[in-house]
Amino acid sequence: MLCCLIKTPIKSCCVKALRFFIWCCFCLPAALQAKETLRMAMPDYPPYTYIQNGGYHGFGYEAFVSIMADLQQDFKIVPEPNYGRAVKDMQSQVVDGLFLASENEERNKVAVFSAAVAYTGWTWVWLKQRTDLKPDSISFKQDAVVSAQLNSNPYLWLMKQHYKVAGAPNNIRMLFTLLNSRRVDAIMLPELTAKAVMQQEKLDPSLYSMQLEMQLPFGIYISKAYIARNPDIMPKLNQAIMRYHEQQKEFASKPSG
């Protein structure tokens, strides 16, 4: 009888120890893997993402932070001067992703594009004095000298469509320098970015004409290398983006005051 009483707790302890060993072997690595910090490139692209007074700002940044909080995902922001630098860092695995961005073939080679967090409207901007310019005309495409931020998606699109592209700067604010000095006839960038730069640089909006060219999804890129280590990240991310939109709708529907 005493032998049986002794064996029972020993057996119970062995079972618990075995369960703990199995958890350490299979569950713990998965739990640790899920906590791998996301190193995210954030281009200087007002009003979506930018740095001001040493802090991160922009509604693209705020949306990203909200989505990561929903996922309970740790992240580290890596500020980038432009999209070209951000994509290179993603290609060399210096960062694990990029936000916010529109989709293109080059980025799709090394990363996966999420559901849309927002939409961006690529817009032509030109001096209002230039009444001869019609961006939707054949002559504009054939003759107008245009520009966009170097290696940005608008720049790559203009090159692919065989526009006469010149003087593409790394700094998006320099586009207006090119335009105001009449070194180019028109520039292309998102409408909200154009308005944000005008405000930051104290430019008079009444001096410019604007015309929407196209509207595209603005989302989050996660590198394929990171996904290989964390295969559940994209479905979870897309679900979190959907919940983010639902929360925004609920917030917008609430009466103010």
Predicted regions and their residues:
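Extracytoplasmic small-molecule ligand-binding "clamshell" domains
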Residues: K35-E105, K109-V110
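Periplasmic-binding protein-like
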Residues: M42-P46, T120-T123, Q199-N238
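Extended ligand-binding regions for polar small-molecule ligands
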Residues: G58-D70, T131, Q142, S152, ...
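Short helices/loops that flank or line small-molecule/ion binding pockets
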Residues: P79, G84-D96, V112, R173-L192, ...
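A conserved helix-loop-strand patch within extracytoplasmic ligand-binding domains
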Residues: A116-K160
